[in-house]
């Protein structure tokens, strides 16, 4: 098999399923093995569409768990550019302002790019850019508890607003779009980020694709 110059890994699953934990763990371990300048990580959240033209109260009403909330075409374009050894400017999203900031983060081409997000496997064009995909399969009740703690502590949300959003959009969109997308995953991972075997399997596959 010909080795790849750039391997793209997608880690998908429900909100607060443990995607970030496993993504960060793999990122840190690969940085130690391959070098920090060879590994990049991109959050799908960075590609929420710009809503600066809307008033803040209207931005709060957006369904952020629907595929249309993301500018996946820009993410696809950036992945193609990174594979062609070009640099890209990744948007910076504000969870408190519910839109992109005026800043961006520059990423250069990497040997391994780790994507993390809820709807990475729902978009067929995006799937074509992905070399290995995993779906974190965590029970929804656990996801909800984690989401409550996270959003109240880190995103200045109230318990009522988190529960209302979960009932109106998060759970319905998971059942309609996110859960069905796991059929496209190469690996389905139970127990979230604590699944050591899944992490080791993924790292082995990455090294194989890199020809290591």
Swiss-Prot record:
Pathway: Pyrimidine metabolism; CTP biosynthesis via salvage pathway; CTP from cytidine: step 1/3; Pyrimidine metabolism; UMP biosynthesis via salvage pathway; UMP from uridine: step 1/1. InterPro entries: P-loop_NTPase, PRK/URK, Uridine_kinase, Uridine_kinase-like. Its EC number is 2.7.1.48. Disulfide bonds: none annotated. It holds the Pfam family PRK. CDD domains: UMPK (cd02023). It is found in: Cytoplasm. HAMAP family: Uridine_kinase (MF_00551). NCBIfam families: PRK05480.1 (NF004018), udk (TIGR00235). Belongs to the uridine kinase family. This is Uridine kinase. It comes from Psychromonas ingrahamii (strain DSM 17664 / CCUG 51855 / 37). The gene is udk.
């Amino acid at each position: 098999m010909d080795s790849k110059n750039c391997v793209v890994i997608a880690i998908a699953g429900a909100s607060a399923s443990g995607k970030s934990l496993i993504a960060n763990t793999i990122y840190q371990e690969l940085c130690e093995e391959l070098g920090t300048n060879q590994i990049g990580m991109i959050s799908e959240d960075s590609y929420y569409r710009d809503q600066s033209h809307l008033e803040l109260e209207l931005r709060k009403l957006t369904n952020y768990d629907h595929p249309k909330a993301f500018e996946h075409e820009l993410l696809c374009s950036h992945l193609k550019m990174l594979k062609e050894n070009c640099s890209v400017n990744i948007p910076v999203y504000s969870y408190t302002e519910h839109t992109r900031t005026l800043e961006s983060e520059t990423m250069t081409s990497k040997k391994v790019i780790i994507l993390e997000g809820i709807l990475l496997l729902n978009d067929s064009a995006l799937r074509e850019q992905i070399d290995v995909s995993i779906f974190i399969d965590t029970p929804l009740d656990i996801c909800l508890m984690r989401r409550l703690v996270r959003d109240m502590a880190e995103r200045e949300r109230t318990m009522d607003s988190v529960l209302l959003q979960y009932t109106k959009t998060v759970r319905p969109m998971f059942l309609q779009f996110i859960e069905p997308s796991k059929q496209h995953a190469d690996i389905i991972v139970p127990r979230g980020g604590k699944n050591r075997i899944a992490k080791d399997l993924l790292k082995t596959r990455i090294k194989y694709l890199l020809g290591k």
